Amino acid sequence: MQNAFTIDQLPLSWQEQLENEWSQPYMHKLREFLQTEYSRTTVYPAKDNIFTALKSTPFDAVRVVVLGQDPYPGEGQAHGLSFSVPHGVRLPPSLMNIFRELQTDLGIKNTTGCLQPWADQGVLLLNTVLTVRAGAPFSHAGQGWERFTDAIVTKLIENRSHVIFVLWGNAARKKCDLLFRSTHKHAILAAAHPSPLAAHRGFFGCSHFSKINYLLKKLERPMINWKLP
C-alpha cells in the first residue's frame, strides 16, 4: 500500500500544491486506514487508480471541475474519475442521465462510459471521497478524504483563475462554499444531481455542457470536445 499512496505518483504541479497537506496527521491516519481496508476486504478503485483524477489533469491544466461524491461500489465500475466507468462497463444511472442531458444540450450521443478524454482536456473529475468498500456506498466517508479533497478545491480557488466549477447536487455546493466568496475569479454552474432521484428537479435542462464551452470561448480557450471515442 505504501507504494500506491505516495505523493511521488502525482504530477509535479499537484505535489507542489499538496505537499503540506500530505504530511498532516489526518493523512497518516487515512493511509493506515486504507492499508487495513485494502488488506482485509475489497475496496474500489484499485490502489493504482485512487488518484487517477489528479494524474489525468495536472493542477495547471484544470479548466473545469466536476465534483462527485464517492466511487461506484460495484465490481469493475470505479477507476478514479467521478461519474466515469471503464470501457465496456454498463452505464450507471447517473451517467446515463448525464449523457441524456448532453444529447439534449448539444446533440452528442455517447455510448461508452469512460470519461478519460474529458479529463485529458482539463476536466477534473474529482470525487469528494476517493475510495469505497465494495457494495457499501459512503463506507469510507469521515476517514479524512473530505478534508483532503477540500484542500484540492481550496488550492484551485486560491491559486488559479477562471476555472469553471460544475456543482451537481447539494453536497457539491456545500463542498464549494468557499467558492461563492470568490466569484470574481471563477465561474459557477449549479444544478440538481444527475441521479434518478434528483435529475428531474433541475439537472435535465441545465445545458451545462454548452454553457461550459460558451464560457471557455469567452476566455479564448479551447472548448471541450464532449464526444467520446
From Swiss-Prot:
Catalysed reaction, written as an equation: Hydrolyzes single-stranded DNA or mismatched double-stranded DNA and polynucleotides, releasing free uracil
NCBIfam families attached to this UniProt entry: PRK05254.1-1, PRK05254.1-2, PRK05254.1-4, PRK05254.1-5, ung
Subcellular location: Cytoplasm
Cited function: Excises uracil residues from the DNA which can arise as a result of misincorporation of dUMP residues by DNA polymerase or due to deamination of cytosine.
InterPro entries on file: UDG_fam1 (IPR002043), Ura-DNA_Glyclase_AS (IPR018085), Uracil-DNA_glycosylase-like (IPR005122), Uracil-DNA_glycosylase-like_sf (IPR036895)
EC identifiers of the protein: 3.2.2.27
Entry annotated with the keyword Manganese: no
CDD domains: UDG-F1-like
Enzyme class: hydrolase
Organism name: Chlamydia felis (strain Fe/C-56) (Chlamydophila felis)
Pfam families in alphabetical order: UDG
Gene Ontology biological-process entries: base-excision repair, AP site formation via deaminated base removal
Active-site residue numbers: 70
PROSITE patterns, alphabetized: U_DNA_GLYCOSYLASE (PS00130)
Protein's name in the database: Uracil-DNA glycosylase
Family as reported in the entry's similarity comment: Belongs to the uracil-DNA glycosylase (UDG) superfamily. UNG family.
Lineage of the species this protein comes from: Bacteria, Pseudomonadati, Chlamydiota, Chlamydiia, Chlamydiales
GO cellular component: cytoplasm
